[in-house]
Amino acid sequence: MYFEYGEKEISYLRQKDARLREVIDRIGHIYRETDAELFSSVIHHIIGQQISTKAQATIWRRMQETLGEINAQTVCNAGTQRLQSLGMTFRKAEYIADFAQKVHEGAFDLEAVEHMNDAAAVQELSRLKGIGVWTAEMILLFCLKRPDVFSYDDLAVQRGLRMVYRHREINRKLFEKYRRRFSPYGSVASLYLWAVAGGAIPEMKDCKPKKSEKKKAERQV
């Protein structure tokens, strides 16, 4: 299952921005896999924090093989130590066990989150241990398939903006300008900026100052 978008979103973004239009035309359609349901998506995102995609996939596969169906009951039954034995840190195992317990006891309502607006859903997900704003926003995009997720906390989105628009840095004010420009299809814009940040268009380079340049500039002030 992939994040779905089509001619409506592409036409809107192409008309809004000439440089993004060039990126879209060069890269073509992007297929990004999404999560089927919210409970497993939260766990999947906690596992993936600060590790490689390959390591995340390995731990997730072990979890599926060990628990079978991944739901609140099976995760609660597994417990923190067994979760940690799958290759994740003890802290992540604690976060996942705590989340499963809240869902099992009815203290966290997954269905309610699915029907909230973006801001409310991010706020509610961020109440969970181990889930910050950025992770909550990624869950909105890759599980709830919300169309207008454009995260200031996403370093790859910022890198993509620097590369496409030749900025040396992206401050909040500048970021908000692009957020407004791409809305209500910020999620699709994010897909293309991630692709650029990952090297999809080799001649686009990151204009962020190197540390040595930044220190030199600071000494001159």
PLM features: what roles do these ranges have?
Residues 1-30, 133-221:
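C-terminal accessory module of base-excision DNA glycosylases/AP lyases that mediates lesion recognition
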Residues 41-46, 78-82, 120-124, 156-160, ...:
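A general alpha-helix detector
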